[in-house]
Amino acid sequence: MVDHVSENSTNVLSAKRKLTEPSLIDSKRVFPCDQCAKRFTRHENLTRHKACHSKAEPIPCPYCEIKCKRKDLLKRHIQRFHNDKSVIEEGSKDVLDVKAAASQQEDNMKIVLPSFDAIDVPKAYHPSLRPYFTILPLIPSDFLEHYIEGYFEWFHPVFPFIHQASFNSENVAASFLRSLVVIACLCTGIESDFSMALLFWDSGFHVLQLYLQGDPERVKKAWVFQSRLLFCTASLFEKTACFSGIGHVLLKDLVHESRTFGWTKLNWSVEGDTDISNLIDLECIRRSVFCLYILEWFLALIFNKPPSLSVLELQMPLPISSALWSSKELLSKDYWRPNPLNPRDALSILVNGPLLLEETNISGFVLLFAIFEFIRDEAKLSMIGLPRQPNRSYEIMLQHLKVSMELSNPCAKTSSIFLCLWHLVLTYYYLPDPLFLRSITLTDLESATSYFKDDSWMDDDYISPCMTTYNLTMGWENVIWGLRYAETELTKFKFDLPVPHLTLFRIFLQGLYALRDFDQISTSSLQTFTMLWKKLSTSLNMKEDAQNTAPSTCVKEFSAFVASALDVEGGWGIGPLLTKAFRPT
């Protein structure tokens, strides 16, 4: 174990040293922008780019409501979308007249149009895109950049399947750009941004669908897969049933395509003529497939949605080193190398001890959900009447994985989210899942808590497993951890992913169901748990009579404390839904 950690540590440190070598800087991009540090291969490209920093008023199109920062872009727009009109010559009176008229128009910035020069926007007018070109007003590029920056600040650090160093918002597909903006809008938790997200989603998704109709092979492009994964994620956690349904259809399609295209076994090599851009695309796809697995099993963990992808299908190396992937310079392919571990190899090591992960974000979550996959499969035994045989190997692997993440030093955001998910998976190991026979949805969370609101303790949808095969005391240690975490840390996740909120919701739900089945625990565990209950009720300032009452009679009182703990604003507006679900009627 020690040798393995030491070897990986040496490799990571070596890679970090190589990143700082001057020879790795892309010598072809010799023209840097003095305002944003972007680099260009040709001076004329730099000159055109500098127009983006200009404070001059954009020039409006005389035939629609599009505005362009440069005259050459306006000419190109007119040629593509108004080809029956004459092209406006530079400096003509028409341009001046239109500019004067445009200054009198109301500046509505609530809708964003597709990028007219993007690869996925039709070169000729298409009727289905008419609202995005003629009816809705244009949002300025600097406003768009605000949300792009938000994406890379809030979402990307946890799920880095986009190569940020090669990402340039000025030359990517319009639909790809909008998929990032949708996620950023949802992360803020601001109601006006939610409305904006739906409009971004609508425009971006329609452009992408039209682009894919033109050539079925386009679905294999890395940016297309990434865009659809982001649109899927946004839909699954949107608070309307319509978008959620679209998200599940997209998820099913993405899983099917990953298998059909062989992406669950995708590998790459630096040998041969493969250039760096191809390597980046292959690594993007591979990381996206891993994130697809994470998404499926997160839905299983929180909502009991039956997953279809298994970790045993992911027969490819884990993502490459974080140091290489996050480098701000495009490296030569000579410095790229595959991760030596695949998920199964890493899991085998975790049985015996921790390991140093070259990449913590995606790898850590994949391994965590893989262990949960094994725990969940074992729990299926109770569905056919077989006794559950707790496997301590899973508990040991979880402990070793936690140490591995600490050794690998992930970013603070990843550490917090991983810790929440880790405690929930451990809770599943110690406590039964009474919702195993059913799924819940984000729009109907109250259905999972209705039993303690109307005193309907018996329900065919819920199972009441034999508690003697579980450890109620250890399970409740995780519930107590969740309450303390919610009190001290949850308020920090205001502009962020809703993972901690949903994870704590599920931990508390498991705890409440365990209280219902409290009377089933063995006598030897009863005394220990009673002491734990008194400790908890005292720390929560519960009434004295509640502290001395059997936990199974205090479900409603405890749920009120849970509702209060979750009553914080957060990304995606999840907090109020969770609070409402737990608040007793």
Swiss-Prot record:
InterPro entries, sorted: Transcription_factor_dom_fun (IPR007219), VerF-like (IPR051059), Znf_C2H2_sf (IPR036236), Znf_C2H2_type (IPR013087)
Phosphoprotein recorded as keyword: yes
Record key words, sorted: DNA-binding, Metal-binding, Nucleus, Phosphoprotein, Repeat, Zinc, Zinc-finger
Statement: the UniProt record of this protein carries the keyword Zinc-finger: yes
Primary location class: nucleus
Gene Ontology biological-process entries: DNA-templated transcription; regulation of transcription by RNA polymerase II
Residues bearing the modification Phosphothreonine: 553
Protein name (record): Zinc finger protein C11D3.17
